[in-house]
Amino acid sequence: ARVQALKPTDAIDASYRRDLLEAFEDSGATLPAAQRERVKAIREELDKIGLAFQKRVNEDGTTVAMSVADLKGLPASWLKDRQRDAQGHVRVGLDYPSYIPFMQNAVSEDARHRLWLAAQNQGGVENIERLDRAVALRREMAAIYGVPDFASFTLKRRMAGTPANVQEFLARVRGAVEAGEKREMTELRADKAKMLGKPVEQVKLERWDVAFHQERIQRERYQIDQEGLRAYFPTEASVAYALRVAQQLYGIEFVPAKVATWHDDVRYYDVFDLKDGQRGDFLGGVYLDLFPRDGKYNHAAAFGVAPASKLTGQRPTSALVTNFNRQGLNHEELE
C-alpha cells in the first residue's frame, strides 16, 4: 500500500514503482492467504530441488574405462598422469578437461559413444525424478496465478512477453541458420565417410561424431589443432596476461591478497581503481577458482559472493569459476 501510494516524479520513478509492484504481485503478496502460503512452499521446494540437482551433478564421479585402442588419437599431453585401473584402462571422467578433448580426438566411435552416453546420464535417475517434481510444482504455481503454464508466468514481465513470441523468434532463427546447419552436417558426414572409406549414403552422423569431425576438418583444412595450442598458452601465464589486459582496458589493478578460501586452488584479488598509474579507490574483490576437482560446479560461470551497499560502504565480491586444463588453454578457453 505504501508503494502504491507513492507518486512518481519522473519516468524513472514510475518504472521503478511499477517494477516493485509487479515483484510484490509475482511473490504472491496479492493472493489469498492459503494460496500465498502454498506459493511460498512451492518456491522453497523448487529452490531445494535446484540445489539438490546441481549437487548431484557436481558429485557424480562417473568415469568410463578406456582401453589402449579406445585412446587412439588422444595427444600425449592429455594422456600424461591419467589414472589407470587394475586392468590398465584409463578412467575418463566427465569434467571439461577430460571430456571435451576426448570427444574431439578419440578415433574410436564406440569409445566416444560410451563417454557421450555417460555424460547424458550424469546425475542419474534421481535427477530425472527431481525434474519431474519441479515440472509438477511449476504447473501448480502457474495455475494458482491463473496463467496457462509456467512459461507464461515467467515471461509476462520480460521482453518476449509470451511463449508464442518466443516460439516465433526461435522459428525465425531456425529459418536463418537452417541452410548453414545442413551444409555443415553434410560436410561432417562426408568427412566421416572419407575416414571410414564408405559411400556417404551408408554413413550416419551421430551426436558423438560432431566434435571429432569438426576438429578433424580444422586440422586438415586450416592446420588448427586445439590440443596442440595448449603448448603455446600455458594456463598460469595466460591468466596473468588476461588480468593485465583487463587492467589496461578498464583502468583497474588486481592485487593478490591472502584470505580464507574454500580450496587451496582458489586465489583472491583486491580490485582497485587506477588513475594516472596510481592506485586509487578499492572497488571490490574477486575469487578465481580455475581448475576442476571432484564435487565442483562443472561448467564456467561468474557468481556474486557479496553485494555492494551504499549504506555501509561495502564493496562487491564475485567469483569466477571455470574448469581449465592445468597444462594450457586452447583457443576457446583463452577466449
PLM feature segments, named:
Residues 1-9:
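Long, charged all-alpha helical bundle/coiled-coil segments in cytosolic proteins
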Residues 11-53, 57:
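Extended, charged alpha-helical coiled-coil/arm scaffolds that mediate oligomerization and mechanical coupling
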Residues 16-18, 45-48, 55, 59-93, ...:
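Active-site-proximal, well-structured secondary-structure segments within enzyme catalytic domains
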Residues 24-28, 98-102, 119-124, 154-166, ...:
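Second-shell loop/turn segments in exported
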Residues 28-42, 121-153, 164:
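A conserved hydrophobic secondary-structure block that centers on an alpha-helix together
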Residues 103-119:
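Short, charge-rich amphipathic alpha-helices with coiled-coil/heptad character
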Residues 103-105, 297-299, 330-334:
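Short conserved micro-motifs at the rims of enzyme active sites and ligand-binding pockets
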Residues 123-130, 239, 331-335:
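Structured ligand/cofactor/substrate-binding pocket environments in proteins
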